[in-house]
Regions:
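Active-site acidic/histidine proton-transfer and metal-coordination neighborhood
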Residues: 1-46, 56, 129, 133-140
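Active-site beta-loop-alpha junctions enriched in small/polar residues
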Residues: 19-21, 50-56, 78-83, 112-116
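Glycine-enriched alpha-helix->loop->beta-strand junction motifs that scaffold or abut catalytic
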Residues: 40-45, 68-74
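Charged helix-capping and loop-helix junction motifs
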Residues: 29-34, 60-66, 89-97
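Hydrophobic faces of well-ordered beta-strands that scaffold small-molecule active sites
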Residues: 14-16, 45-49, 74-78, 107-112
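Aromatic-rich peripheral "rim/lid" segments of glycoside hydrolase catalytic domains that contact
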Residues: 115-153
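Active-site glycine- and acidic-residue-rich loops that bind
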Residues: 23-28, 49-59, 84-91
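A structural alpha-helix within SAM-dependent methyltransferase catalytic domains
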Residues: 1-7, 34, 38, 65, ...
Length: 153
């Protein structure tokens, strides 16, 4: 019903996020999310991939992106495995960006991180330490790292 309403209301896309199994049993991997989008069948429901969750659930970042394809990939969080500064941890960003380029995705890539000083959110997301001196530092360094990786693709 929500997807139908969004479609009737205007050019509204709903993106469903794949979240790791420690937080939910619903839509943990890209394959499940694409199936969900197809089952809804309205054409305005897409997949939201999040690197933090992907590193826990997907066997391959590139295969997850290719499973979505341009048709179903609608939004991306480019964050690190610990939700810290992108490009400083375990996420295979080069592989991820190559796959994104291959499918022709041209939507948003958003850094998502959390500051432990925002206690309610930090507690809900299990963030117990700082990843940078300020949120600005995290964003600036993360963006610089991601741009450097993207330049190699």
């Amino acid at each position: 019903e929500v997807a139908e309403y969004a479609k009737e209301t205007g050019d509204v896309t709903i993106c469903v996020e794949c979240v790791n199994r420690f937080e939910t049993h619903f839509l943990n991997i890209a394959e499940d999310a694409v199936k969900f989008c197809k089952d809804v069948g309205t054409g305005n429901v897409k997949v939201h991939l999040d690197c933090f969750h992907m590193i826990r659930e997907e066997k391959s970042f590139s295969e997850a992106v290719k499973t979505c394809g341009k048709q179903y990939l609608g939004y991306v969080h480019v964050n690190e495995n610990d939700r810290g500064i992108p490009g400083t941890g375990l996420v295979p960003f080069k592989e991820f960006f190559e796959a994104i380029k291959e499918i022709g995705y041209d939507g948003p890539l958003v850094i998502e991180s959390f500051d432990p000083s925002f206690e309610e959110l930090a507690g809900n997301c299990a963030i117990w330490r700082s990843f940078a001196k300020t949120g600005e530092e995290l964003a600036v360094k993360g963006l610089a790292n991601l741009k450097a990786i993207a330049e190699t693709v």
